[in-house]
Amino acid sequence: MEEKLGFKPLPAAIALGLALLIWFVIPVPEGVTPQAWHLLAMFVGVIAAIIGKAMPIGAISIIAIMLVAITGVTSDKPADAMKDALSSFSSPLIWLIGVAIMISRGILKTGLGARIGYLFISVFGKKTLGIGYSLALSELLLAPVTPSNTARGGGIIHPVMKAIASSYDSDPEKGTQGRMGKYLALVNYHSNPITSAMFITATAPNPLVVDIVAKTTNTNIHLSWSTWALAMLLPGLAAIALMPLVLYFFYPPEIKQTPNAAEFAKQKLAEQGPMSRGEKIMLAIFAILLILWAGVPAMLFGKAYAVDATTTAFIGLSLLLLSGVLTWDDILKEKSAWDTITWFAALVMMATFLNKLGLITWFSAMLSNSIEHLGIGWMGASALLLLAYMYAHYMFASTTAHITAMFGAFYAAGLALGAPPMLFALLMAAASSIMMTLTHYATGTSPVIFGSGYTTLAEWWKAGFIMSVVNLAVFVIVGAVWWKMLGYY
């Protein structure tokens, strides 16, 4: 019956029921427009359908786009409503994600990915845990000079991780992801939010945090690059040290000990022989991507020579096509890229209009006022604000949108309730990256790695929640002590 219908009846019914309940039964709160409330109903229904696997996520997204267009929640004019529903397909972030996946195919096709994987194994391959730490440290080394966390985690580290997993025949298509691919994919991803929190230049929205903090405090607090890096150094390193161990405990790989891995890797490298033409071109393009993503031209020659992260991705893909390393058929066959572009665009669109229609602003103001009247002191109030701010990211498909919508209101509320400005600024700044752990649509890196198929949706969300708790605890406890020692509050 499920095959004939094209959807699973029970999860589809639950998703529809939730949407109808919010739309028709729960009254529209004061201060919220009917359009915003109805869009929330659809958003909740879509997320429920995705979680319940009522249909493939891309198919659900097509239906979501149709519903936004036909209900007219964003515009009374049908043509404008359709434009709104498709608006995120023009988002540079969406295409950065998709093109990063396409580029990673070149690393695998040429064999360069396997070569890098074997080199990693020869050095760190005695234990799977050691390979996990090597991926995390690679992320950390790249983070200060890679402003796109999607490019870093999805375009640079992820192909290497896939190559290592493949070398142990850990492949989702073969049902062998549990050997080590699942664990390594989770380490690959959860390195990303931690390193993003450690440097202003590690993810695009961090400068926005700096700007909001400065404006809210009338420039009394300005988080410079060095101040931010020093503040996040100790808690960040502690989080990086804990993360592979925590994931190892909850998602232990089937292959734990690899005592012969170094010799095995050397044999494989010998079998590969000298680098092929394709590998050399791929390596050169890889270097070009890294240089441009790191913003080296702008550093050397000024802002006029800055290259956008998505433009960089298209440069890389264009060079791969021109050189013949990848063909257009290769691009067309990269189903996960096209699937990711579709579903991520739909979710970003819905989250964007929840913000534009004022629902997120209403929610932030309501929560801030409610906490203020509890009379629980600045510590309790700040804790509630921090938790509400971070876990509200379940409703967002963009960290930039989330920070824009909520950071200022929540930070101002914390200051009004007596929170030390520098302490609360650093905690909120850390939470702005830690919240990326939560879902498979939380940031650009998540759909790239989740789309590789190493984990189920339930496993991804469970790991995300666990790591959000661990990371937040580390930054609150270690951070608070470290920042006190530095005299920040």
Model segments located where?
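Hydrophobic transmembrane alpha-helices of multi-pass small-molecule transporters
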Residues: 1-96, 216, 220, 226-365, ...
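Hydrophobic, membrane-inserted alpha-helices
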Residues: 17-20, 41-48, 135-141, 188-191, ...
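Membrane-embedded alpha-helical segments and adjacent helix-loop junctions characteristic
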Residues: 28, 59-172, 334, 338-417
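Re-entrant/interfacial helical elements at transmembrane boundaries that shape
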Residues: 65, 150-166, 185, 198-217, ...
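Alpha-helical transmembrane segments
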Residues: 91-101, 146-156, 228-244, 423-435
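Alpha-helical transmembrane segments of multi-pass membrane proteins
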Residues: 97, 129-143, 169-196, 222-231, ...
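C-terminal transmembrane helix pair
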Residues: 167-173, 233, 346-350, 360, ...
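Membrane-core helix-loop-helix motifs of multi-pass transport proteins
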Residues: 168-256, 446-479, 489
